[in-house]
């Protein structure tokens, strides 16, 4: 994600405070210069950058500060607060009502990724248990209906459109009426892309809006145009009642920061951001968690939401087995399935404090997903006895012929099968030790259920299993312990502690 470059530069500037022996005006000005340069390079409007600098300077009076105060943390807090303000329009975004029919109309310029974004939004709500559908009212662009149809079919989302009817108002009206009669909760209408100067298309957009009376009009905006987004958003707001904005293509353009701040300047709430071409490269936009992730401070709230989506609490049988320190190959297979359901690895890693959104490149991510699928393919070639055995890898060591059979069945080498079994053995040993810790699976605050000595042992075991590079990014053992504590308590509000920003 190109925005990660901005995050890395700002984080580097903030960390320079830690290297300074004394925090004085000179150090503060040097740090602010680095932050402002990074923002200007990301195409943030110079007036907004100047305002941020002035606000931080006025909030931090080094001469008036009491000697006992932690000046570094006060400065970091002030910068964090101003960065949040930079992308916060200060307007509450529209949200759909469960059990009600919510009609959402998409508008935007040609090439902004509007049709793809329609499918992403429908898929996002579908995964959360909403009844969603898509309507293609774009009769201007050749192939628009085919594209929407292809996306909808792949995601198994009902859709409506026509190859013969050329009036978008009729298509939109018929589609909305059809899906309302079928009690769909999220009805998304894709309209023709337009350019600012095309009055006829603007007129068409108004006619469609008047016909279907949408609950929310979403303007889809391409991040690559940077701060020019402000003029565009205002032009559309003047014509129709744009209630929300989705910014796309944030993964490939250095001007993403400028685009986000420009939209915020129009007082239009950004509800989602597009971070890639795949259907799950799509995230809700929340200002504080966004800045937290940008600076490598994580988003525990978002991570917990992802885990809750999997409904892991329903898996009582697994919890019971873990209590007794049991973990089979089938259990590992099911956990791999859960990881796949959570979405792109880079998105998940960005939510873990200590990892930036740049920690895993697209190439590494694809490689990791391919490796995970390969491991699952190997397990697909195992029989029930092998998958459900509590002896795990011992079944294979007693009868080496099983390894050769699984390797042939999955089209891999015997070494690949042995590597999987080695990995599984590490997991199983960890679970066995966890099973011996009373109170670990009671739920609630882990610190109240588990003794400090047992918790220390558990953290040491986890640290041994982890890649040293990963542990370093988390801030060593202290970072790992802090993350475990936050995740168990479901505490999203104190994620800043991960980088030492405890007073934020």
Swiss-Prot record:
Region described as NG domain: spans on this chain: 1-295
Lineage, top ranks: Eukaryota, Metazoa, Chordata, Craniata, Vertebrata
Binding site for GTP: 108-115, 190-194, 248-251
Name of protein: Signal recognition particle subunit SRP54
Keyword Mitochondrion: no
Compartments, as annotated in UniProt: Nucleus speckle; Cytoplasm; Endoplasmic reticulum
Involvement in disorder: Neutropenia, severe congenital 8, autosomal dominant: A form of severe congenital neutropenia, a disorder of hematopoiesis characterized by maturation arrest of granulopoiesis at the level of promyelocytes with peripheral blood absolute neutrophil counts below 0.5 x 10(9)/l and early onset of severe bacterial infections.
CDD domains the record matches: SRP54_G
Presence of the UniProt keyword Cell inner membrane in the record: no
Domain notes: The NG domain, also named G domain, is a special guanosine triphosphatase (GTPase) domain, which binds GTP and forms a guanosine 5'-triphosphate (GTP)-dependent complex with a homologous NG domain in the SRP receptor subunit SRPRA. The two NG domains undergo cooperative rearrangements upon their assembly, which culminate in the reciprocal activation of the GTPase activity of one another. SRP receptor compaction upon binding with cargo-loaded SRP and GTPase rearrangement drive SRP-mediated cotranslational protein translocation into the ER.
Gene3D superfamilies: P-loop containing nucleotide triphosphate hydrolases, Signal recognition particle SRP54, nucleotide-binding domain, Signal recognition particle, SRP54 subunit, M-domain
Family label: Belongs to the GTP-binding SRP family. SRP54 subfamily.
Keywords: Cytoplasm, Disease variant, Endoplasmic reticulum, GTP-binding, Hydrolase, Nucleotide-binding, Nucleus, Ribonucleoprotein, RNA-binding, Signal recognition particle
A family per Pfam: SRP54_N
BP GO annotations: exocrine pancreas development; granulocyte differentiation; neutrophil chemotaxis; protein targeting to ER; SRP-dependent cotranslational protein targeting to membrane; SRP-dependent cotranslational protein targeting to membrane, signal sequence recognition; SRP-dependent cotranslational protein targeting to membrane, translocation
PROSITE patterns the record matches: SRP54
Spans annotated as M-domain: 296-504
GO cellular component, one term: nuclear speck
Record function comment: Component of the signal recognition particle (SRP) complex, a ribonucleoprotein complex that mediates the cotranslational targeting of secretory and membrane proteins to the endoplasmic reticulum (ER). As part of the SRP complex, associates with the SRP receptor (SR) component SRPRA to target secretory proteins to the endoplasmic reticulum membrane. Binds to the signal sequence of presecretory proteins when they emerge from the ribosomes. Displays basal GTPase activity, and stimulates reciprocal GTPase activation of the SR subunit SRPRA.
Record field: catalytic activity: GTP + H2O = GDP + phosphate + H(+)
Top-rank taxon, per record: Eukaryota
The protein's assembly and partners: Component of a signal recognition particle (SRP) complex that consists of a 7SL RNA molecule of 300 nucleotides and six protein subunits: SRP72, SRP68, SRP54, SRP19, SRP14 and SRP9. Interacts with RNPS1. Interacts with the SRP receptor subunit SRPRA.
InterPro entries named among the record's database cross-references: AAA+_ATPase, P-loop_NTPase, Signal_recog_part_SRP54_M_sf, Signal_recog_particl_SRP54_hlx, Signal_recog_particle_SRP54_M, SRP/SRP_N, SRP54, SRP54_euk
């Amino acid at each position: 994600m190109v925005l990660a470059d901005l995050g890395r530069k700002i984080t580097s500037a903030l960390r320079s405070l830690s290297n300074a022996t004394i925090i004085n005006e000179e150090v503060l000005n040097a740090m602010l210069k680095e932050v402002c340069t990074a923002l200007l390079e990301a195409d943030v409007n110079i007036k907004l950058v100047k305002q941020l600098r002035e606000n931080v300077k006025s909030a931090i009076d080094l001469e008036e500060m009491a000697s006992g105060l932690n000046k570094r943390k006060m400065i970091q807090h002030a910068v964090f607060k101003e960065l949040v303000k930079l992308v916060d329009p200060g307007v509450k975004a529209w949200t759909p009502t469960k059990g009600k029919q919510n009609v959402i109309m998409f508008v935007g310029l040609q090439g902004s990724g509007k049709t793809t974004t329609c499918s992403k939004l429908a898929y996002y709500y579908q995964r959360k248990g909403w009844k969603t559908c898509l309507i293609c009212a774009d009769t201007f662009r050749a192939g628009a209906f085919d594209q929407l149809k292809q996306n909808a079919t792949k995601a198994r989302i009902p859709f409506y459109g026509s190859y013969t009817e050329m009036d978008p108002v009729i298509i939109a009206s018929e589609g909305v009426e059809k899906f309302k009669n079928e009690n769909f909760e999220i009805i998304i209408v894709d309209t023709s892309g337009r350019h600012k100067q095309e009055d006829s298309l603007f007129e068409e957009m108004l006619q469609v809006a008047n016909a279907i009376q949408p609950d929310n009009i979403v303007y889809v905006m391409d991040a690559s145009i940077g701060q020019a987004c402000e003029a565009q958003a205002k032009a559309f707001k003047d014509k129709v009642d744009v209630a929300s904005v989705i910014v796309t293509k944030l993964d490939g353009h250095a001007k993403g920061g400028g685009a986000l701040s420009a939209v915020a300047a129009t007082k239009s709430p950004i509800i989602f951001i597009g971070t890639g071409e795949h259907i799950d490269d799509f995230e809700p936009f929340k200002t504080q968690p966004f800045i937290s992730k940008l600076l490598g401070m994580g988003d525990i709230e978002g991570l917990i939401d992802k885990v809750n989506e999997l409904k892991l609490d329903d898996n009582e049988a697994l919890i019971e087995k873990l209590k007794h320190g049991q973990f089979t190959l089938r259990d590992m297979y099911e956990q791999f399935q859960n990881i796949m359901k959570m979405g792109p690895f880079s998105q998940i890693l960005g939510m873990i404090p200590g990892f930036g959104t740049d920690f895993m490149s697209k190439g590494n991510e694809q490689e990791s997903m391919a490796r995970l699928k390969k491991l699952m393919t190997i397990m697909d070639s195992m029989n029930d006895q092998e998958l459900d055995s509590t002896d795990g890898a011992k079944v294979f060591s007693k009868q080496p012929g099983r390894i050769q059979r699984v390797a042939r069945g999955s089209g891999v080498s015997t070494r690949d099968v042995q590597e999987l079994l080695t990995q599984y053995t590490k997991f199983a040993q960890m679970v066995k030790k966890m099973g011996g810790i009373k109170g670990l699976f009671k739920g609630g605050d882990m610190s109240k259920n588990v003794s400090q000595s047992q918790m220390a042992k558990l953290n040491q075991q986890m640290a041994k299993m982890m890649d040293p590079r990963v542990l370093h990014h988390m801030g060593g053992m202290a970072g790992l312990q802090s993350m475990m504590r936050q995740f168990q308590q479901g505490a999203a509000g104190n994620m800043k502690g991960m980088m030492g920003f405890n007073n934020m």
